Amino acid sequence: MRKQKDGVIVNISSIAGRFGLPFTSLYNSSKFAVEGLTECLHYELSLFGIDIKTVAPGSFRTGFHDSINFTEDEKKEDLDVVRENLKKALEDGIKNEPPFPFGFGNNDDVANFVFKKSITKSKVSNFIGRDTKIINFFIKIFGRELLFKIIKKLWFSRILPKKELWADTISKVYC
């Protein structure tokens, strides 16, 4: 690409690179890293005529939620309530959605979007999915702090309703 002074690199990130969630530190921080790396390389590679961008999908019907696992520890059965509540909340959000582009799509929808972004001029960060547009709009209008408060309230009410389990659960995931 440098020799040709032309090329496009598309990194796949996630809407999870825009905000953190409890128990998703490793996943979300890796997505934040992809966003940051892409932004830095955008400036550097533009000197060689190379375009680099991210595509950050939101929720899609991919089976991703089936792979939720917080720890390989033998104590992981203690996290079953968290894992099951989180999976249920995510699945409930997806199952009643209309088809893409008005709701959640599938892997083919993301692949087509990535291809389109690779052959057209587009922004450095590109979001796909209705939830990504809603979250980005919310952050732009109300700021991240209000989003954090809402996430915390939803987390404690839907995912881990018994606050006394919070510290114990955290220690099993991160210690």
Predicted feature residues:
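Active-site-adjacent segment of SDR/Rossmann-fold oxidoreductases
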Residues: F19, C40-D51
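Active-site loop immediately N-terminal to the catalytic Tyr-X3-Lys motif
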Residues: F19-S25
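C-terminal beta-strand-loop-alpha-helix "lid" module of Rossmann-like NAD(P)-dependent dehydrogenases
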Residues: S46-P98
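Rossmann-fold scaffold of SDR-type NAD(P)-dependent oxidoreductases
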Residues: N11
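A short helix-coil junction within the Rossmann-fold of NAD(P)-dependent oxidoreductases
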Residues: M1-K5
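Active-site helix of classical SDR
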Residues: S30-A33
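Residue(s) in the substrate-gating loop at a strand-loop-helix junction
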Residues: S14
